[in-house]
């Protein structure tokens, strides 16, 4: 059976996975060491962002352990379910990290009363908030606009619409006809109240399925399922970069204020 990822891609992911924990610890230390002026900003940084990034790192490690990227056999339902739980939590906390960083800035800069709650955020349409950031950070945030779009879509689907799940497997084009024939025969066996024949046909049909480590929510609402291992890594690295840039922004604002 063929693995979904090639060897080079697998090696790259394993390598990056090794740095998730040290990068998390480094970011935590930096945020804990930062001298916050506002107590709410400090709470959002220490108990919001810092806690979420730790959860995100753990979720990624769990998802990679439960369903490794090199998996070729369809994992058990329990394993798929456990991986889904971790991916759902990862998406929710990635979204939460971004939101927490926006609130850290708003409180630390004393903007909570002048910016409406609906305008607190880092996307292009959060105009009032974006105006308070440096041109350099605004430019960087512009490059993340499509990533923000994906994140909001997946988080909203998880929170309000169809939860994220890992399809148990797909059938290769050459096996489509055979799989459909077995599906029809399974239905006939059920109608004939013949559970043993149904189980036999189901086992036969499952042999045609190939595992693909993809995640999706609604087939009607999204263009195509997405490979979750590289996406989890990319999300983590984006949150880390954003966290470091926001820390730089806070430090620059504090320095300018003290002069």
Where are these regions (language model features)?
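Acidic, Ser/Thr/Gly/Pro-rich intrinsically disordered interaction regions
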Residues: 1-88, 92, 100-259
